[in-house]
């Protein structure tokens, strides 16, 4: 029998969202939050603008890109991008994990954009990136949060593309190197990677996206909470911290603290190094394991932050129901032993384990 290990992680929180807080986090960091004040007050606006400015600074986002704080986490941000920006041309939808497949469903069944192409593949691989028609708009997840498979870089996106690129980067920012020149609408949430609180999203728009917003009106109605233009002009206030609905100023303070921590360790390059280091430890263990393997089949596409593991050898011969039961049993055991929390993969993904790595 295998001897029970004695060493345990210093941090037990491996959830992929909400993710663990940064090292040394304490509720005391919230003492300067703008509580009981309107988010429209000078103090509230200042806090929101600080959050936007720090986001730009720490992700090195170009000055001519707009950054907005929007409702409903990354889901709200990517839906806002889709409902405002898509429809002027067909869409190339790339989907290889749970959330990308959700965005595929939106384009195919809700927006019903004619002429669209669906590059849908199974968990563990990504579509052929060199079969994409860039005369069309593109939507993709940079990092597959539920499959552990990411795009290797942005080299496959041409500079002279005609369509827009919409990128769900919610578990990629601060963990992987994004090329902003290749991205026209990029989204993420505070709860992923940074360990922020839920319900708030970030929408980043390129000049090309802004130009389309001001010159194109979708054929479908846009709900008030999604509207980014008025009289065919960008609502600039959204990108100065004048949010479309009321944000939690407590969550804003927490997000600012997370960004200040990123700054203290060298910006996003520092968090990438941290994620890479943590991933190297997991990879060494997986390479030596006789019962788990990476769900992602390609070394080039292995995620360093949303690590998804499948069962191998005899365990892989179990049916799906039994594999899911086994994953839950492992999750419960590690929870009860206070070794790891929240490591069972998403219910819509193949059975296995999932670990989020940056702060750990």
Please describe what each predicted stretch is:
Residues 122-174, 185:
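Active-site phosphate-binding strand-loop segment of PLP-dependent enzymes
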Residues 76, 84-138:
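PLP-dependent aminotransferase-like
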Residues 293-333:
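Conserved PLP-binding catalytic core of the aspartate aminotransferase-like
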Residues 191-283:
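Active-site C-terminal subdomain of aminotransferase-like
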Residues 1-42:
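N-terminal "arm"/small-domain region of PLP-dependent enzymes with the aminotransferase-like
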